[in-house]
Amino acid sequence: MANPGGGAVCNGKLHNHKKQSNGSQSRNCTKNGIVKEAQQNGKPHFYDKLIVESFEEAPLHVMVFTYMGYGIGTLFGYLRDFLRNWGIEKCNAAVERKEQKDFVPLYQDFENFYTRNLYMRIRDNWNRPICSAPGPLFDLMERVSDDYNWTFRFTGRVIKDVINMGSYNFLGLAAKYDESMRTIKDVLEVYGTGVASTRHEMGTLDKHKELEDLVAKFLNVEAAMVFGMGFATNSMNIPALVGKGCLILSDELNHTSLVLGARLSGATIRIFKHNNTQSLEKLLRDAVIYGQPRTRRAWKKILILVEGVYSMEGSIVHLPQIIALKKKYKAYLYIDEAHSIGAVGPTGRGVTEFFGLDPHEVDVLMGTFTKSFGASGGYIAGRKDLVDYLRVHSHSAVYASSMSPPIAEQIIRSLKLIMGLDGTTQGLQRVQQLAKNTRYFRQRLQEMGFIIYGNENASVVPLLLYMPGKVAAFARHMLEKKIGVVVVGFPATPLAEARARFCVSAAHTREMLDTVLEALDEMGDLLQLKYSRHKKSARPELYDETSFELED
């Protein structure tokens, strides 16, 4: 792994933190980690424009009514528990069976109470099954419940051509089969569907090697390794990089896979406020000054865990500042680019390209193929000695089954498209169209008066709903208008910050986006969701420049 302090790396392992010394920096980068060519008079001339983010607070009355709604729901929940215990309530699905009385509880008391009395009321808005490719339009299986959302049954009816605003299909590559996918069919005929072995045994194919070389070339790093599962790419590789005697500094809004990997590592974990470099620097300073608890020994390693784009907030990591801090305090940086690779940057190369940074300034680049590439799995990229070390020590490499050959071919096909290696500019057009669709969609929502979170360049667009009753009404009304949306609430978000999360795609036409926006405008008035107090801006004059064909 690259040593930001200039120290040596032995067998891919990070050296003891106290032994790191100030060394020469990358020849292409200045002290703050920004490429020299992207600076004017020592200051980045574009950085301030890139960090344009909105996290408007809700009006006081909205928060008051939100907590009142939860309070009323809680009171009725206790009343229903009382009625269940006395056998008065008709639905007994929430009552513990007698033969399970001595079982260890699966959930804490509050989580259990919340699930059976609050979540179950609106459960029909989650886990909706689809029966088509998750393109810009999809088919949804209709279902109903006869026991207040504890179980569902399918009616046999299919809701056709629902506008898909929930899938992470950023570049529109998750599509029905067409002639351009013939290579996937050919790979399926030659290699079959699975490898039936691990990478350490007989599970490494030439397709895996081809994919890893292509990923490294795409990211402009020395080497890369691919894994069959994106979640496990984080949770099973972080324990191979750090352990006891190490310190992990993690953003408070990091994905569960990062949190799980950090916990499994056995390292000490400290949390810094979301995208707050002052909070991060305080933790770094204290770590260097005080060392480990009780012994005061220097930390073996200090690893900073962040994401490129945060999927619940739509915010982009403040990468130049974090790189400056990791250099200053001789720490290491691990970035999860699951939602940014392929979707952020002029050519889709993620947050390093977005900020004009040298990718070698980041010690560990992680990403998944489940979003922009229309496939599954993940990768770790960086220095060759880092990747070689993970090939030997990663739990995913040693124990997990290798990536399916057709999946690997789909990723190869997608990468070649994005990089222009297929002889066309269709990949670049998709990246550019995604950026235009994102800006258009976000600015129209702001004009309407909604509170939306995140960076104006992030294709994940959270729209704040706040009140639990409005969450259910919003999702149900949108489905009636044949628009599929994802709504999110506690525990995935803070209790009073329930939201709808829209995922913009390059495959969305302007007509589709306008249909969604028209429905949102109507829902905003009906449910009184237009909470923003900011001055509305003029509508941007953006035009639909989609030039690639969309599948039927």
From Swiss-Prot:
Q: What class of enzyme is it?
A: transferase
Q: Which PANTHER family match?
A: CLASS II AMINOTRANSFERASE/8-AMINO-7-OXONONANOATE SYNTHASE, SERINE PALMITOYLTRANSFERASE 3
Q: In which pathway does it act?
A: Lipid metabolism; sphingolipid metabolism
Q: Which Pfam families match?
A: Aminotran_1_2
Q: Any idea of its EC number? A: 2.3.1.50
In terms of Gene3D superfamilies, this protein maps to: Aspartate Aminotransferase, domain 1 (3.90.1150.10), Type I PLP-dependent aspartate aminotransferase-like (Major domain) (3.40.640.10)
Q: Which cofactor does it need?
A: pyridoxal 5'-phosphate
Family recorded in the similarity comment: Belongs to the class-II pyridoxal-phosphate-dependent aminotransferase family.
Q: Which reaction does it catalyse?
A: L-serine + hexadecanoyl-CoA + H(+) = 3-oxosphinganine + CO2 + CoA; dodecanoyl-CoA + L-serine + H(+) = 3-oxotetradecasphinganine + CO2 + CoA; tetradecanoyl-CoA + L-serine + H(+) = 3-oxohexadecasphinganine + CO2 + CoA; octadecanoyl-CoA + L-serine + H(+) = 3-oxoeicosasphinganine + CO2 + CoA
**Gene Ontology terms describing biological process:** ceramide biosynthetic process; sphingoid biosynthetic process; sphingolipid biosynthetic process; sphingosine biosynthetic process
- What protein is this chain from? Serine palmitoyltransferase 3
Q: Where is this region: Disordered?
A: 1-29
Q: Which organism is it from?
A: Homo sapiens (Human)
Regions that span the bilayer: 59-79
Show the CDD domains listed in the entry: KBL_like (cd06454)
Summarizing the function annotation, the protein's role is: Component of the serine palmitoyltransferase multisubunit enzyme (SPT) that catalyzes the initial and rate-limiting step in sphingolipid biosynthesis by condensing L-serine and activated acyl-CoA (most commonly palmitoyl-CoA) to form long-chain bases. The SPT complex is composed of SPTLC1, SPTLC2 or SPTLC3 and SPTSSA or SPTSSB. Within this complex, the heterodimer consisting of SPTLC1 and SPTLC2/SPTLC3 forms the catalytic core. The composition of the serine palmitoyltransferase (SPT) complex determines the substrate preference.
**Key words of the record:** Acyltransferase, Endoplasmic reticulum, Lipid metabolism, Membrane, Pyridoxal phosphate, Sphingolipid metabolism, Transferase, Transmembrane, Transmembrane helix
The entry's localization annotation reads: Endoplasmic reticulum membrane
Tissue expression as described in the entry:
Expressed in most tissues, except peripheral blood cells and bone marrow, with highest levels in heart, kidney, liver, uterus and skin.
Which GO-annotated molecular functions does the record name?
pyridoxal phosphate binding; serine C-palmitoyltransferase activity
Query: How's its activity regulated?
Result: SPT complex catalytic activity is negatively regulated by ORMDL proteins, including ORMDL3, in the presence of ceramides. This mechanism allows to maintain ceramide levels at sufficient concentrations for the production of complex sphingolipids, but which prevents the accumulation of ceramides to levels that trigger apoptosis.
